[in-house]
Amino acid sequence: MPVIVNLDVMLARRKVRSKELAEAIGITESNLSLLKSGRVKGVRFGTLAAICRYLECEPGDILGYERSDDDLKAAD
């Protein structure tokens, strides 16, 4: 998948535990774990905004994009 989730990196930088973040933004630890691992098909903007607010970061600090040849073929 070309979208890279760096949430675990940001949590470590901010010294915040997953449980703390999940409680603060109102989602389950299980859902946060799925998001951290990239095993989700999408994330709501509201959830992303809440994460960024709590961790004092930007969406680009959490999400990245890695281009691949397959992406170019799919665009054709």
Language-model segments: what does each one mean?
Residues 46-61:
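DNA major-groove recognition helix of helix-turn-helix/homeodomain DNA-binding modules
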Residues 1-16:
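A short, Lys/Arg-rich alpha-helix, primarily the initiator
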